[in-house]
Amino acid sequence: MSKLQQFPLSKGWSFRDNEATSEDAWMPVPVVPSVVHQDLQANNKLKDPYIGFNELEARWVNEKSWTYKTVFQKPAAPAGSCIVLAFDGLDTFAKVKLDGNVILENDNMFLARRVDVTKALEAEGDHVLEIDFDCAFLRAKELRKQDPRHNWASFNGDPSRLSVRKAQYHWGWDWGPVLMTAGIWREVRLEVYSARVADLWTEVQLASDHQSAQVTAFVEVESVHSGSHRACFTLSLHGQEITREEIGVTENGTAKATFDVKEPSLWWPHGYGDATLYEVSVSLVKEQEELHRVSKKFGIRTAEVIQRPDKHGKSFFFRVNGVDIFCGGSCWIPADNLLPSITAERYRKWIELMVHGRQVMIRVWGGGIYEDYSFYDACDELGVLVWQDFMFGCGNYPTWPNLLESIRKESVYNVRRLRHHPSIVIWVGNNEDYQVQEQAGLTYNYEDKDPENWLKTDFPARYIYEKLLPEVVQEYSPGTFYHPGSPWGDGKTTSDPTVGDMHQWNVWHGTQEKYQIFDTLGGRFNSEFGMEAFPHMSTIDYFVENEADKYPQSHVLDFHNKADGHERRIATYLVENLRTATDLETHIYLTQVVQAETMMFGYRGWRRQWGDERHCGGALLWQLNDCWPTISWAIVDYFLRPKPAFYAVARVLNPIAVGVRREHHDWSVTHAQPPKTSKFELWVASSRQQEIQGTVELRFLSVNTGLEVRERIVHENVSIVPNGTTNLIVDGLIDHTVHSEPHVLAARIWVDGQLVARDVDWPQPFKYLDLSDRGLEVKKISESEDEQTLLISTKKPVKCLVFEEREGVRISDSAMDIVPGDDQRVTIKGLKPGDAPLKYKFLGQ
């Protein structure tokens, strides 16, 4: 017997181009996991592909094959034990050879692979491990040619990508480069053991009154020899053991223990309670000797997707522990094109930003990867709900028998790997594949329920989303809701706003509607929508090396924006709304204002609709992050620098948010007439679970003078509806013949004497306003070792006051509207005494 030992094979690797034959061609690999682009850079064979036009200089890598090699000593293996070579991820077509003998062939990036090498390592001394990585780009093209009858309809990247189980964004997307990586992208190690815990998971039954829970822990055991193994289960909370139980392992290698938990501490998304995590541990024992120990954290909670008929159609919203949750959040793409470079610390910083921005859900998009454990651990610990796509995106995938088998293994592996995470509340079959079906005119008869028929149509991928994947989720994570696609709703068109989720791209893409009416364009759950903006100047300084290229329409800036038609779309939204500028810094700022306003108009209205029989169940903006330094829809750039939209969204997602908006008049139509009157509305949105009392004030302030143009409106002792919307004014009227000068509507709400939220509605568009000479004052009123407080005041209304984003500095608020008589405080952490003050900019400055 032997206790499980692990020997990571992270050092001592070398690699070379497969076409090279000389020994001199081998180059050292600093550390594994890695991909070839990282290793080429480390050997000065490749420039940073994220800078300038270097992506083009890296294109040769995409069509190459590579070999990785290491030499290792056979680990000591006591009698009765085995030696296993374990790969957590190989990217992608990999032939693994041990001492010249092929022991494994891999064609799926998303699968872990294990090979028993006990006999292969019988000889003492050195052993040579080689991995040949074939070119995925060329293999995909070969596979496509083998099936010319399949309709290879797709958006983004070469359509041949659909034949390969590799991160689809590697073929390039409308926000990322074409970087076809290859390599040992997750850990590789040797394991020596006589028996091991192959899997540990829990199933939780929470009583309806939440006063008790039943936790059943399951274990699967692999052993070299059958025998009297015992599983010692322990249940802990905050490091303190609650209970334990010892169970004999059955002949088929399973054991389970059931624990009754009284008055359990529930797992909640942040803002609703503590994200409490229990820990279950199992010690595998034989003859009083511990052979292997595994621990996993889990949460006690319920999670449902509520779909029920109502006056708007059919609802789609999330309920956790019996509480309806408005899921304001973001979509997530891989945080780097070179995946092994993402550290656990970097993952956690991203999720901390989500919490700082009051976002409660993150959608792991289907064109990337099933994320690293540290991503989900951070979501568990910080209370962020996860919408998890399976890795299919924007295409009509083929369904060859061997590909279906690979997909089944991939889905089983990843559902089993991730099922203990309480943050994951939904599995979704794909991203926009049903939209591809619609646009390509592929066959989809929702009434045909025979899966074998689906395989015979020109849209065979339906079999994956409506049979294979739901069966896997039902078998391995039966308590998690499954949704066939995003967007999708009961087989109706994907743009149907009455059912399921929808991707609303008629702002930016599509009909390019005015962002001021975004709230009228939504559906039951808006799982994608967005607006592009430039990143901050410091990010552009990173990838634009030549000062002469730092102007808005430069070649290199266009190259770093992969969105089709971005020039026309950015220009359209800028010229419709703002006084444009030709200098780069102002141009950056103006695009950020447009993005912030777009997100605000969408989120604000959709959150208000939550209170109307859950008309809108949530909004996940496209997108939170970037995979390289670029110009995109991200609200936080590659270097974790928030754009103004990040703060605009955070304010709208405040637990208590006041909203005010006037009727939108479109000045761009033919023969537009100035309105004589405009309607306005005032409301409060609350995610609090109890009714509260508040005082709401609405002021009407001249843009030109800062003075009140009419008597303010005050609602005292207002009863704020719990977890919903309280409409205070639905038929307000502005008489432009009486109050002709442009003015803002400035709303505030106090609860228990504390000012908790603000909103300012402006005359649209901004380009018609004179925003000069604001009388803004930003004054430091306190300072400590790493924190400063600023007091901001103004004589006239100020639009979108944005502070500089600096490395290691966190700002409590930015992209703020400031009005006279309402001084605001901003806390800055990480700025030390003597540091230069943060620069700031506002509209019209």
Curated annotation (Swiss-Prot):
The active site is at 432 (proton donor). The keyword Protein biosynthesis does not apply. Pathway: Glycan metabolism; N-glycan degradation. It comes from the Eukaryota. Keywords: Carbohydrate metabolism, Glycoprotein, Glycosidase, Hydrolase, Polysaccharide degradation. In contrast to clade A beta-mannosidases, which are likely secreted, clade B proteins appear to be intracellular. This is Beta-mannosidase B. It comes from Aspergillus fumigatus (strain CBS 144.89 / FGSC A1163 / CEA10). The lineage of its organism: Eukaryota, Fungi, Dikarya, Ascomycota, Pezizomycotina.
